Design a protein with these regions (language model features):
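Short helix-loop-beta junction
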Residues: 111-123
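Charged/polar low-complexity intrinsically disordered segments, enriched in acidic residues
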Residues: 2-5
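A structural preference for short, hydrophobic beta-strand core positions in alpha/beta folds
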Residues: 126-127
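An N-terminal, well-structured beta->alpha segment
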Residues: 9-113
Length: 127
């Protein structure tokens, strides 16, 4: 069990360091550096031990920094993946509809998603 935790911790540290090398916003980098320095292994593992999964209900999770949390970068990866699929499946005249609600960051994530679709030449309606 201790070996499993150590393996997860090392894997999580490596993923966190990879994120620090990406061109991400400074507030995300600050949070990652805090996670690495504060020694809270549980938080570091929870944030970075795996990639957020896309299930039948879409992406579900806790908002925060890391590959296993909901944030603009994990939303962006899922959106780019969906864009790639749509362009293969439909090839032209693709359009999407994005709805947001009153939940935390819902509007921001919707607008970020719309920008990614737009960059992929996918017509997007946001409401």
């Amino acid at each position: 069990m201790k070996n499993d935790i150590n393996r997860l911790l090392e894997q999580s540290k490596k993923e966190a360091i990879k994120w620090l090398n990406y061109p991400i916003e400074s507030n995300y980098k600050d949070e990652i550096n805090t996670l690495l320095k504060e020694g809270n292994e549980e938080n570091l593992i929870e944030s970075f031990h795996k990639k957020l999964e896309f299930g039948t209900g879409g992406i579900r999770g806790i908002i925060g920094v890391g590959s296993n949390k909901i944030n603009k970068y994990t939303i962006g990866l899922a959106t780019q993946g969906l864009s790639n699929y749509l362009k293969i499946k439909f090839q032209s005249n693709i359009s999407t509809a994005i709805a947001y609600d009153s939940r935390k960051f819902s509007r921001e994530f919707a607008m970020f998603t719309a920008k990614i679709f737009s960059a992929n030449k996918i017509k997007t309606f946001v409401f």
